[in-house]
């Protein structure tokens, strides 16, 4: 069950419950104005920024009555979802509620269908008590109380669970039991996708792009939390501090636009493209483009790049998990090295086999890139083998099963 996000979705919602690939699917129709206020203003422009630590506190947030109106829309969407679940769910069913968009559903379902057992899973990081103060007090407390109405709340890492509990404690909200269930790729599905003709064609293009040079790769949405600009600046610092890498390494960035209704995202895209141009103007030669940026959403090419990297840079400011950090090692056949932000949830699983960096430290990131590029083959192979094992340890199936298990009377 999901909210209808577009006019075609709303037309589909009018058909009621549908059968899609053997699944019963229902789209819940919420009017466009209400949905936009809830999704764009509350979720994308506020909750996402709070949980990822993205606000520039000198200027934002600055809440007024417009946020209050948007929060009422957020509440309305959650009520609509609760009403729909109440009508569809069998007696005593387990309801798995996903992410920060729907933190209030269980609170409303408790009155409508007390027989249902609701489990919430947060895919993002969870902010700490200081970060939560960047929301209006009433909204923050209502959100926590809504999460507290679940029989359990799940997170990708223990540190996000601990932050949630700390927020509840500070505001006098009783936290439900929490559990940790890291999501992972499906290795078989990933391998099947990588074996497609489109990926084979893209692999030839990646080989030509590298031109015999070492290859640093990143695959991301153009999203402030992904820290793309600092990654580019760290690459510039690598070329400054270690001139032996000039004309010997190419940074291939497969980055695609996201949430361009938000001014921060439009500005960040401009900053990314201008930084790419700056690095290339500074170091490029007639025969070498230091940074090759592909701004299209090209999944086959992204898979091909993940199969070919010598170094994979994943340096988010904060990330609930980051699946690319797991997909890369599973796809890569070069014993590629992973340079990974300590603030990615995946670092809690992969950190021993990756080169972990502070995402704000350009010098440390540049040094990690140099270390990765100069690492001897036995260490590369050892780390790559460990990464493959760790990345495959959790699958979509184990993640799903953990949520269902958390709904059982003995809990997580």
Where are the predicted features?
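Catalytic cores of carbohydrate-active enzymes across secretory and cytosolic contexts
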Residues: 1-412
